[in-house]
Amino acid sequence: MKDVPGFLQQSQNSGPGQPAVWHRLEELYTKKLWHQLTLQVLDFVQDPCFAQGDGLIKLYENFISEFEHRVNPLSLVEIILHVVRQMTDPNVALTFLEKTREKVKSSDEAVILCKTAIGALKLNIGDLQVTKETIEDVEEMLNNLPGVTSVHSRFYDLSSKYYQTIGNHASYYKDALRFLGCVDIKDLPVSEQQERAFTLGLAGLLGEGVFNFGELLMHPVLESLRNTDRQWLIDTLYAFNSGNVERFQTLKTAWGQQPDLAANEAQLLRKIQLLCLMEMTFTRPANHRQLTFEEIAKSAKITVNEVELLVMKALSVGLVKGSIDEVDKRVHMTWVQPRVLDLQQIKGMKDRLEFWCTDVKSMEMLVEHQAHDILT
């Protein structure tokens, strides 16, 4: 049995932080007000006084461990995560987290958070195989939780960092966006916002099968790059989203300086040409989606002979549905893959809806005026 009162008294006199906080901890512990004590400890472990040294490890060993069985499992793991950061040996930290996982197995959320922390440590020491297995295991558990919880953001942070490490741009793009969807952007430092926006933008451009940029373009994190030396990335993303090949080529002086983009220029050109075809289909009225080879060639900046191959590629990856008339050199589109729209695209859709409403109104007036002739 540890001497908890003695530890708390000593800490009031010479421990880190304010003596009043230590006194409050002693008071709540003595009165056995476990919920209030948990909240106080959760707040205290984030105090800057613990930024250096092993104060949190001592706090756990001499105090928290004595009543941890009375603490809400998820709150206990939240506290433990701060303690673990002071452990310099990752193997010691992993063993500690494994023991904690056993203690909180009554709560799925607590187990998920614990496993996520284990995965993060494994990623830091370069054990990619175990990290991958942990992500797969935790993802299955997350799918069984109702709605979005406080543990989702930590999981998506881990999974996106793993995919970034192994160079899987498409999966990184997906999970990094999910992470941003689970947090308040104001809680992230501007420097982190800028770094996340930049890596997300690059991943979107380079990611195989990523044709949806609307969600990123509408997210406030991208604004952190505006009016900086990385503004060109925003412009490039907008060019891709609208399938503007000419604009993309104009911006080459900027994006061409980025090594990854420069090395994948041919792949980027193919992607924006596919997006160009999607945008041409989307902006046409549903009853007028006949595209000539010449129109496609002009917009996509390719020769007429290359059009059929471009359309076949778009059809094969499911971006559009339709048929090719080789004789008349036309393409008839019947469907285009849904995407998150930017404001300009939404305005275009609004204009087309208003045009359709006007058409319907005109037809209504025509029928009204000629009703007598029609009925007789």
From Swiss-Prot:
Alphabetical keyword list: Acetylation, Proteasome
GO biological process, one term: meiosis I
GO molecular-function term, one example from the UniProt record: structural molecule activity
Domain PCI: residue ranges: 171-338
InterPro entries: PCI_dom, PSD13_N, PSMD13, WH_DNA-bd_sf
Residues modified as N6-acetyllysine: 298
Protein name: 26S proteasome non-ATPase regulatory subunit 13
